[in-house]
Amino acid sequence: MTQSCTLTLVLVVAVLAALATAQLNFSAGWGRRYADPNADPMAFLYRLIQIEARKLAGCSD
């Protein structure tokens, strides 16, 4: 019984240590590094592609 309690305690400590390491390596800006704060160029390209797709669809008739 003592051996299983010791093993459980060691596993819990190992998991908590791994979680603490992960928290130390996390940075708040990580998820935002690929986000473009100015999405206007993306919207322009999207509209341009839509216009060209409509032109191509009109040519196939």
From Swiss-Prot:
GO terms for molecular function: hormone activity. It comes from the Eukaryota. Residues 1-22 form the signal peptide. One of its GO terms (cellular component) is extracellular region. One of its GO terms (biological process) is flight behavior. Keywords: Amidation, Cleavage on pair of basic residues, Disulfide bond, Flight, Hormone, Neuropeptide, Pyrrolidone carboxylic acid, Secreted, Signal. It is found in: Secreted. The modification Tryptophan amide is found at residue 30. Its main location: secreted. The modification Pyrrolidone carboxylic acid is found at residue 23. This hormone, released from cells in the corpora cardiaca, causes release of diglycerides from the fat body and stimulation of muscles to use these diglycerides as an energy source during energy-demanding processes. Adipokinetic hormone precursor-related peptide (APRP) can form three type of disulfide-bond dimers: p1 (alpha-alpha), p2 (alpha-beta), and p3 (beta-beta). Belongs to the AKH/HRTH/RPCH family. This is Adipokinetic prohormone type 2. It comes from Locusta migratoria (Migratory locust).
